[in-house]
Swiss-Prot record:
Residues 219-369 form the TrmE-type G domain. InterPro entries: G_TrmE (IPR031168), GTP-bd (IPR006073), GTP-bd_TrmE_N (IPR018948), GTPase_MnmE (IPR004520), MnmE_dom2 (IPR027368), MnmE_helical (IPR025867), P-loop_NTPase (IPR027417), Small_GTP-bd (IPR005225). This is tRNA modification GTPase MnmE. It is found in: Cytoplasm. GTP binds at residues 229-234, 248-254, 273-276. Homodimer. Heterotetramer of two MnmE and two MnmG subunits. Belongs to the TRAFAC class TrmE-Era-EngA-EngB-Septin-like GTPase superfamily. TrmE GTPase family. The lineage of its organism: Bacteria, Bacillati, Mycoplasmatota, Mollicutes, Acholeplasmatales. It comes from Acholeplasma laidlawii (strain PG-8A). K(+) binds at N229, S248, I250, T253. Pfam families: MMR_HSR1, MnmE_helical, TrmE_N. The keyword DNA repair does not apply. Exhibits a very high intrinsic GTPase hydrolysis rate. Involved in the addition of a carboxymethylaminomethyl (cmnm) group at the wobble position (U34) of certain tRNAs, forming tRNA-cmnm(5)s(2)U34. GO terms for cellular component: cytosol.
């Protein structure tokens, strides 16, 4: 593909040792050479670095620089690329960029370098999204997941599914179009059914395991619930190790939901401390209680706090019922006091004495199936778009199974199989994708 040569600052603006300006395109080397005093860049080898100066229009020195040259196709974009390391001040970096643009080079749009890498075949769409995930990662495991995708572990998994679906389509099409072909396998429903079923089993396994990688990438919506004054806010503060929520002996002091984030052994929890659920005494508290119910409904993990020093109350029983079908950990707080609670808890802690918190953290990872992670656990899908497309492919394969059950013609199967194949291709970006690229790459920073 032929594109205009583009440039942008690739490092954050600010005072630093250096800033880097990236230039990519057919004229990258020749245009930069026009304003560079040093070696003739048109004659240097790829992957070399050169000292010199960027010159003003009148020939005076604008800045002392180091220039890295990457000749196509051995660059990130598969185009000629020049990276100019300038001094790291805001003004000087902007001035050097302006000087580059004066040569006729265009200012890059956000994400345009990564977009070119995709369009030129350097990376697929999954890898492009992985670059953004690395930039925005909030924990070490999220970086591991993104690096797996960047190194094609995810792409290979989807390619394998695509290949199996395509083989099935091809064999069915041969039966339809060339029934006289002696070597063609006769694709009866008895032969098609188990192969589609195997594909569905494989997809279901990927979706199940992808829930864990999605937790790692995006964090886990975790709601702390309990009746008033059982220690919810104290638990939040203990996990955060800071006074984030209001802690008081007065029932109902947390009148709204409070959000905070904590990194727990490579997994980010979005902690939501809710208002205690009871019969609210005023309008403001009622709003907080209503939001608590909504938070429970939307939560991926519920930390239900009970008071070990008191017997089970009506409010406790209501919360146990309200959360029984959720991913839930029942926590007994105030283990430093005599216990009167009649039911078993998963974990016993004392937020006052800071006891049992490490046990709780281990229980959280175990409940989310994020304990004892091994290298292959980071291979699965974590991106919402990928998971949605895989679910759509699954739906199409289920339509094939349904068509078989209703004894429909074999050519009907090919239609749904083709849809499944297209949905898998959309994950990688090698099928039709409309405005997806513009939307996706616009989320990148300029120098990417």
């Amino acid at each position: 593909m032929q594109f205009q040569t583009i440039a942008a600052i690739a490092t954050p603006l600010g005072t630093a040792g250096i800033s880097v300006i990236r230039v990519s395109g057919d004229e990258a080397i020749s245009k930069v050479n026009q304003i560079f005093k040093g070696k003739n860049l048109n004659k240097v080898k790829s992957h070399t670095i050169h000292y010199g100066h960027i010159l003003n229009e009148d020939g005076s020195i604008l800045d002392e620089v180091m220039i890295s040259v990457f000749i196509a196709p051995k660059s990130f974009t598969k185009e000629d690329v020049v990276e100019i390391s300038t001094h790291g001040g805001i003004l000087i970096t902007q001035k050097v960029l302006e000087r580059i643009l004066e040569t006729g080079i265009e200012l890059a749009q956000p994400g345009e370098f990564s977009k070119r890498a995709f369009l030129n075949g350097r990376i697929d769409l999954v890898q492009a999204e992985a670059i953004m995930d690395i930039i925005h990662a909030t924990n070490e495991n999220a970086i591991k997941v993104a690096n797996k995708a960047l190194n094609k572990a995810t792409s290979s998994m989807i390619d394998n599914l695509k290949s199996k679906v395509l083989t099935l389509i091809a064999q069915i099409e041969v039966n339809i179009d060339y029934p006289e072909y002696d070597d063609a396998i006769i694709m009866s429903k008895e032969l098609i059914y188990p192969r589609v079923n195997d594909l569905l089993d494989e997809i279901n396994d990927i979706l199940t395991k992808s829930k864990r990688t999605q937790y790692i990438r995006e964090g886990v919506k975790t709601v702390i619930v309990g009746r008033p004054n059982v220690g919810k806010s104290s638990l939040l503060n203990a996990l955060l190790n800071e006074e984030r929520a209001i802690v008081s002996d007065i029932a109902g002091t947390t009148r709204d939901t409070i959000d905070a984030f904590v990194n727990l052994d490579g997994v980010t929890l979005q902690l939501i401390d809710t208002a205690g659920i009871r019969d609210a005494l005023d309008t403001i508290e009622k709003i907080g209680v209503d939001r608590s119910r909504k938070a429970i409904h939307e939560a991926e993990l519920v930390l239900l706090v009970l008071d070990l020093s008191q017997k089970l109350t009506k409010e406790d029983e209501m919360l146990l019922t309200l959360t029984e079908h959720k991913n839930r950990i029942i926590i007994g707080n105030k283990k430093d006091l005599p216990s009167y609670l009649e039911i078993d808890t998963n974990v016993q802690i004392s937020t006052l004495e800071k006891e049992g918190l490490s046990v709780l953290e281990s229980e959280i990872l175990k409940t989310l199936k994020l304990d004892n992670l091994v290298d292959k656990d980071f291979n699965y899908l974590s991106n919402v778009r990928h998971i949605q497309k895989l679910k759509e492919a699954k739906t199409s394969l289920e339509s094939v199974i349904n068509a078989i059950h209703h004894d429909m013609p074999v050519d009907i199967y090919a239609v749904d199989l083709t849809t499944a194949w297209n949905r898998l291709g959309e994950i990688l970006g090698n099928h039709q994708y409309g405005d997806l690229l513009t939307e996706l790459f616009s989320k990148f920073c300029l120098g990417k």
